From Swiss-Prot:
Gene Ontology cellular-component annotations: cytoplasm
Disulfide bonding pattern of the chain: C103-C195
Protein name per its UniProtKB record: tRNA-specific 2-thiouridylase MnmA
InterPro entries: MnmA-like, MnmA-like_C, MnmA-like_central, MnmA-like_central_sf, Rossmann-like_a/b/a_fold
């Protein structure tokens, strides 16, 4: 069997490659480049990011040391079309985008996966922390590193051709394997920031794309102006540090793109127990009305809920109020370790 592995240049995918090769599979590594190298020249990278020129250097050395062929794939145009354009549009609409969720669907396990299959690859692998069992997506055993939230966008029929070798291991175990195997990136830092905003300067990035960021009013829930924001792209639902003094702790409760305004309120005002979800990706066979738990952010606590499909939208009713349900973010549904499905939060009901 021929396995194509997404080799990022980091320790996780390097160890995944190492494990699969030791199991005797024929391996071909693929390293994707989402931005041109010159894009990074005049940017000071604050934290480790993926898909940088240094990652390409590391990926080449990992593949060479392992004795497997490596294909470097330039995905600049499709990445701009599917991810960057979407990211810009969502923020200008006052929503909070989730580019990693869509990158997994459209780029890594979409466009690139199709290219790999055209090359004759039978199975696709990566260093993600998750599991695929009998065609179902499951959480990783290491719940702190679990990445099933971002992988829940993958189309159901593609899961049967995907394997995640790291899903049953902890990060410490992965680093230990890498160190013992002499893999040079065994202590490499994890990626933290967006690959297309390596310096973390959102304002600069938007203005480079021709979108001017404007300041605007901040209103309390009664309509009284209490301050000025620095541009809607700098805020998300539930954010507390907004630079105003309101006499009490306040949070962003609404982002009004049509008025270029923020609405703030107290903690109770930013809690919701009913919301709608669009672009639902169902990963298991289940009735259109079902019970599950839901996560509305990568690091949020799962909350029990009832889910129903109504007029091509999923309506979610949680058993308790959920903090900071942000339109544009992914809502991912679970039963135990199994991912039931996922979609994009449309609005609070």
């Amino acid at each position: 069997m021929k396995i194509g592995i997404l080799l990022s240049g980091g320790v996780d995918s390097a160890v995944a490659l190492y494990q699969l090769k030791n199991e005797g599979y024929e391996i071909v590594a693929y390293h994707m480049k989402t931005m041109k190298d010159e894009f990074f020249l005049n940017r000071q990278v604050k934290h480790k990011i993926c898909c940088s020129p240094s990652d390409t250097v590391d990926a080449k050395l990992i593949a060479k040391t392992a004795g497997v062929p490596l294909k470097v794939v330039n995905l600049h145009e499709i990445f701009k079309e599917k991810i960057i354009t979407y990211y810009l549009q969502e923020y200008t609409r006052g929503r909070t985008p989730n580019p990693c969720y869509f990158c997994n669907r459209f780029i890594k396990f979409g466009y690139l996966m199709d290219l790999m299959i055209e090359d004759g690859v039978d199975v696709i692998s990566s260093g993600h922390y998750a599991r695929v069992v009998d065609g179902k997506l499951l959480k990783a055993l290491d719940k702190e590193k679990d990445q099933s939230y971002f992988l829940a966008s993958i189309e159901k029929e593609r899961l049967k051709k995907i394997v995640f070798p790291n899903g049953d291991k902890t990060k410490d175990e992965i680093r230990d394997i890498a160190k013992k195997a002499g893999i040079h990136v065994h202590s490499k830092a994890e990626s933290q920031d967006l690959c297309f905003i390596p310096d973390g300067d959102q304002k600069r990035f938007f203005e480079e794309q021709g979108i001017k960021i404007k300041s605007g009013p901040i209103f309390d829930k009664y309509g009284k102006k209490i301050g000025e924001h620095t541009g809607l792209i700098n805020y998300t639902i539930g954010q507390r540090k907004i630079g105003v003094s309101a006499g009490e702790r306040v949070y962003v409760t609404r982002i009004c793109a049509d008025r270029n305004a923020l609405i703030v309120g107290n903690e109770k005002d930013v809690q919701s127990d009913k919301f709608s979800v669009i672009d639902f990706n169902l990963l298991v066979d289940i009735d259109k009305n079902f019970e599950a738990t839901v996560k509305v952010r990568k690091n949020s606590t799962e909350v029990p809920c009832k889910v129903s499909l109504e007029n091509h939208r999923v309506i979610v009713k949680t058993t308790m109020p959920v903090f900071a349900v942000a339109p544009g973010q992914a809502a991912v549904f679970y039963r135990g370790d199994i991912v039931i499905g996922a979609g994009i939060i449309e609005k609070i009901l």
